[in-house]
Amino acid sequence: MEYSTFGKHIIVDLWGVDFSLLDDMYFLEHHLIHAADLSGAHVLNVSTKEFDPHGVTVLVLLSESHLSIHTYPEQNFAAIDCYTCGTTVEPQIAIDYIVSILKPNEMHIRRLIRGIGEIVNTD
């Protein structure tokens, strides 16, 4: 079987997110898994890390690639990354869901197409 190298990669910076949401590893883990499911991705594994005194990283390993969040609660900031290979998964659905639960005051986003030669910025 031949596989396509085509992929969609979305990177997002969120500012003005509630401290308590960004410092709750279990809340974020639950919602990232749900976001992956909504996008049509298949979750293989989840890795989490709480930092001292604050901050969380959640990495959701997908059959199609990955979904991750790194938080800096003291700055009310989160960095989200979602990369999916192929055409059967829509990473924007995962991103939209996460943004809807974190409710940032400000968002910066880049959408890239990868695996077709040159990386294409679709913004």
UniProtKB/Swiss-Prot annotation:
Extract the PANTHER family matched here.
S-ADENOSYLMETHIONINE DECARBOXYLASE PROENZYME
- Site feature: Cleavage (non-hydrolytic): 64-65
The active site of this protein is located at 65 (schiff-base intermediate with substrate), 70 (proton acceptor), 85 (proton donor)
Subunit notes for this chain?
Heterotetramer of two alpha and two beta chains arranged as a dimer of alpha/beta heterodimers.
Q: Which residues form a coiled coil?
A: none
Give the top-level enzyme category: lyase
Function field: Catalyzes the decarboxylation of S-adenosylmethionine to S-adenosylmethioninamine (dcAdoMet), the propylamine donor required for the synthesis of the polyamines spermine and spermidine from the diamine putrescine.
Report the superkingdom from the record.
Bacteria
Entry keyword Transport: no
- NCBIfam families, per the entry: SAM_DCase_Bsu
Q: What does this protein's record comment on cofactor binding?
A: Binds 1 pyruvoyl group covalently per subunit.
Pathway linked to the protein: Amine and polyamine biosynthesis; S-adenosylmethioninamine biosynthesis; S-adenosylmethioninamine from S-adenosyl-L-methionine: step 1/1
Its EC number(s):
4.1.1.50
Q: Which UniProt keywords apply?
A: Autocatalytic cleavage, Decarboxylase, Lyase, Polyamine biosynthesis, Pyruvate, S-adenosyl-L-methionine, Schiff base, Spermidine biosynthesis, Zymogen
Q: Does the record bear S-adenosyl-L-methionine in its keywords?
A: yes
Q: Which residues in this protein are found as Pyruvic acid (Ser)?
A: 65
What reaction gets catalysed by this protein? S-adenosyl-L-methionine + H(+) = S-adenosyl 3-(methylsulfanyl)propylamine + CO2
Similarity-based family: Belongs to the prokaryotic AdoMetDC family. Type 1 subfamily.
Q: Which organism is this protein's natural source?
A: Bacillus anthracis
Protein's name according to its UniProt entry: S-adenosylmethionine decarboxylase proenzyme 2
Question: Which terms does the record give in the GO molecular function aspect?
Answer: adenosylmethionine decarboxylase activity
